Amino acid sequence: MKAKVYVTLKKSVLDPQGKAVQQALAALGFTDVKDVRMGKYIELELNAAADHSVGPKIKTMCEKLLANTVIEEYRFELV
């Protein structure tokens, strides 16, 4: 089983990396891009079979290590 975790800055937090990418895209002529938000993608390969206990474990991993919940939000999917 695999878990895909997506971590992004909260909307209320300034994203300087995203702003730099947006400006670089504009300099390259891609002026249609209104906003860019950068984040992290994490893939976890799990030994566990798909059951109801996996979701809470991934949530705990995110809250304790993978995301800084003060400034970041996360979501995950099990595949």
Describe these PLM feature segments.
Residues 2-4, 8-41, 56-79:
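Long, contiguous binding/interaction regions
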Residues 42-47:
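Amphipathic alpha-helical segments that form the core helices of the histone-fold
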Residues 48-52:
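Helix N-cap motif at beta-to-alpha junctions
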